[in-house]
Amino acid sequence: MSDSQTLVVKLGTSVLTGGSRRLNRAHIVELVRQCAQLHAAGHRIVIVTSGAIAAGREHLGYPELPATIASKQLLAAVGQSRLIQLWEQLFSIYGIHVGQMLLTRADMEDRERFLNARDTLRALLDNNIVPVINENDAVATAEIKVGDNDNLSALAAILAGADKLLLLTDQKGLYTADPRSNPQAELIKDVYGIDDALRAIAGDSVSGLGTGGMSTKLQAADVACRAGIDTIIAAGSKPGVIGDVMEGISVGTLFHAQATPLENRKRWIFGAPPAGEITVDEGATAAILERGSSLLPKGIKSVTGNFSRGEVIRICNLEGRDIAHGVSRYNSDALRRIAGHHSQEIDAILGYEYGPVAVHRDDMITR
């Protein structure tokens, strides 16, 4: 084994159930064995687990429920305790304690809450406890949900300061086409940058019991790689897959980390789900992308959503393409009022000012 590393392992519902309606406990036992072996060798392991809704449905005897958010939250509330109990029981066989962390998007949007979550996660790791993370599905609304555990795992990897992120799924990795319908599809072993062409071939491999697909795994890989974290998509059914990843053995698809990782503050900006959106003109787009400039109010064409000063927002060009994320110096109402105006007019319009820029370049990261 190499020197101690931190690995985040994301386990999708399809991996935990084997595509069935119930948790595949024998397979979960094997995955825990692999993690425990790495833990004993001095590595730090973080589990991001799906399966709460599937566990709840199984525990209640597969009830016929309406396809509503309330029904899913009911199942998650029942299943979450069953799921963490299972992880606790299995890791305890190896004398390893686990600690549960339930997160929502709000924990990532607010800088203070982000730092608190980071400190809690790292404290667990520092005390040789395996964090078991899931989204708080029992209470999260659409407005505060991360939305899928692929993206949640990327955020967890950032919080943990991970070296590697392993996304285990029911596919061997990313293919040139959907291997279920195209026998000519080839496994892509190495990716050095995610572009539109790669997103176009990602397809959709959603399990009937889960909420993620290959496209969300690409999103997660993009976030993690830009934060300096190697990301691997591999089949959870492959024997010894977790140990192989830590040994550097080629499995699945490896997304190579960005050579110059983001600094800590920009990791938060990149990982935080945007609280709102602004559209900018061609001049502002060029200034941001080509010259690395701050965004001035003059370049803003429209503001979407309601957000506070200090929240992360999405910056889009006139075609609607996401070009950058950044921390807004003004709230949404103020930006609507000063949009299209010169910076020297801000004080006259608002009666106050927080500086001449809407989003400073030091608080911005291009996509």
Swiss-Prot record:
Optimum pH is 6.5-7.0. InterPro entries: AceGlu_kinase-like_sf, Asp/Glu/Uridylate_kinase, G5K_ProB, Glu/AcGlu_kinase, Glu_5kinase, Glu_5kinase/COase_Synthase, Glutamate_5-kinase_CS, PUA. Interaction with gamma-glutamyl phosphate reductase (proA) seems necessary for kinase activity. Requires free Mg(2+). Inhibited by proline and ADP. Disulfide bonds: none annotated. It comes from the Bacteria. Pathway: Amino-acid biosynthesis; L-proline biosynthesis; L-glutamate 5-semialdehyde from L-glutamate: step 1/2. One of its GO terms (cellular component) is cytosol. Catalyzes the transfer of a phosphate group to glutamate to form L-glutamate 5-phosphate. This is Glutamate 5-kinase. It comes from Escherichia coli (strain K12). The lineage of its organism: Bacteria, Pseudomonadati, Pseudomonadota, Gammaproteobacteria, Enterobacterales.
